[in-house]
């Protein structure tokens, strides 16, 4: 189980790194096998997602955190974060009420400079709320 403070910090680090287009920081928050499932249903491997951020195909301009809650789904610890996010995704710009459910695992290779939480996301599921 992830403590509320660590959950909020992990989610905040992810949102801030997305807006900064800091792919190294995002990488430090995700496991090697992490997949982001977009609200369209497209499952995007981490390497592809980070590539799209690096080349500007996906630009996160701003976010306002509305809520961050630790939770469990089928016994797995998750962080359920809700933001109002402005982004340009593959050419289309908009502002969305974005929910990301991040499945959390202990960090087997801690990078305390970029990720001091002791956890990483192994899966991210995006939807609207």
Describe each PLM feature range.
Residues 78, 96-129:
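Short beta-strand edge/turn micro-motifs at domain boundaries
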Residues 51-97:
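Surface-exposed, charged secondary-structure patches
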Residues 37, 86-88, 105:
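A generic structural motif
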Residues 33-44, 55-59:
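A short gly/proline-enriched turn/hairpin at secondary-structure junctions
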Residues 14, 26, 34, 49, ...:
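Hydrophobic pocket/interface hotspot
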Residues 1-33, 64:
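Short, low-complexity N-terminal intrinsically disordered segments enriched in polar/charged residues
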